[in-house]
Regions:
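Conserved P-loop
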Residues: 1-31
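Short acidic, S/G/P-rich loop/turn micro-motifs used as interaction or catalytic elements
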Residues: 6-8, 49-55, 78-81
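Phosphate-binding/switch region of NTP-binding enzymes
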Residues: 63-124
Length: 124
């Protein structure tokens, strides 16, 4: 998990504690990509592409260099509900999942694997 600007902040630590997430052998939390050996992981979460200053070109290079890894890319949103950055990101991802008010949903406009739906995420 590459936490970017949130790494080590009280809000981030509270978030991890609330979810019961603690670093262990299957989870590594770092501030930036340079602190992570990507090839050692099956899944890499980038939170967020905006705070990590990752461009669509950077990501394409990362995908080419690490073809066996899966990436979950978080993007900051605008007040109008769009994600920030280049529209080229839409062509790089398999599924776009929108999250708002503890509800995660796909809109059907970008889901290579079919269907659309929603799920509610309850935070304790």
């Amino acid at each position: 998990y590459v936490a970017g600007e949130q790494f080590g902040t009280p809000v981030f630590i509270k978030f991890l504690n609330r979810l019961g997430i603690k670093p262990h052998s299957n989870l590594t939390i770092v501030r930036n990509l340079s602190a992570l050996n990507i090839q050692n992981f099956d899944v890499v979460v980038l939170d967020s592409k905006d705070s990590l200053n990752i461009t669509d070109v950077d990501f394409k290079e990362m995908q080419a260099k690490y073809p066996k890894q899966s990436f979950v890319i978080l993007s900051q949103g605008t007040k109008s509900g769009n994600f920030t950055g280049s529209e080229k990101w839409r062509n790089l991802v398999d599924t776009m999942i929108y999250c708002e008010n503890l509800v995660a949903y796909t809109s059907g406009d970008k889901n290579r694997w079919g269907g659309k739906g929603s799920m509610r995420v309850d935070a304790q």
